[in-house]
Amino acid sequence: VTTRTPIDSSPFHDLLIVDIGGTVASAYAGKLYADYGARVVNLEPSEGFSTRHIAPLLDNGTSAIHAYLHANKQSVSCTDSVLTHPAILAADLVILDVSTLPTSLAVDDFDTNVCAISWYGLTGPYAGFRGSDASIHALTGLMHGIGHTDGPPIIPTGYQAQVIGGLSAFNGSVGFLLGHVLSGPERSGAFCLDASIWEANMCLTDIGAAMSFNNQPMPKRLGINRFAPTYPLGIWPCKDGWLGVTVLNPSQWAAFCQLLGLDDLAMESKYQSSMARLDDVGIIEPRILKALSEHSAKDLFYRGQGMRIPLARVPTMEELFTVDQYVER
């Protein structure tokens, strides 16, 4: 059963969030507020947010990524003082990115709640360093496990580090706003949340610190789309399209084998272990690929849903506007 929540019944419908950062990280934090019903206003400089120029660009020059990040938001051009703009004065929360903050402004200049996003945090030895998604991937150690076994690590493309940073900024600022509401009349003054993109991304590799502390060897790079301990894992071709597969526990493995008619693999006792399956990838994967090639991605996806298998159908550009889950969202 699916229901649509009216905007005035959404959890954040009475919040005004103002984004003056204009980066992927600040925009993603604002996007999550907008998704939950908040009124989000982009206070943009005369040249517009930097996200407006991120490729790919549509025929009319619009950035597809910008459109995704800023759906259901309002944009206002600010040519005068940011601090005295009516949106800032009325805001429940101002989201900013230190990397795009004008030199004439400081984080402490605002008299309202602030979520200050930065690459490395507002304090510490890296605070003044310039950052990038690639540098975050390198510093967290994420790149160590990506790439061919006999080659250099591969730098992930896209803006994954900033998206995770924006998600963390959203979670943290929601907590502060909730604390203000619960405190009632006794609440303290405005807060400033120091949201470090680097710190947020440590969630991906913090287990490595524990392994190092216990003198355990770091996992070796296993090759393209090989990440211990999960297998099968990857985006694979089907008869007519591609399917994302993430199978970990024994019940998922049994259901996946049933879906593809590979019952003998499901019955193999040692393959109840995901790591054992990964060790025998040379035996298992050719059979999986052959079975996938005999079915459509759409058919496998919907049948797999009913069997509680973690599958993701990869739509073509032509299908994006007709995929049911996207239409509903």
List each language-model region with its residue ranges.
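Conserved Rossmann-fold dehydrogenase catalytic segment
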Residues: 122, 150-159, 181-201, 217-228, ...
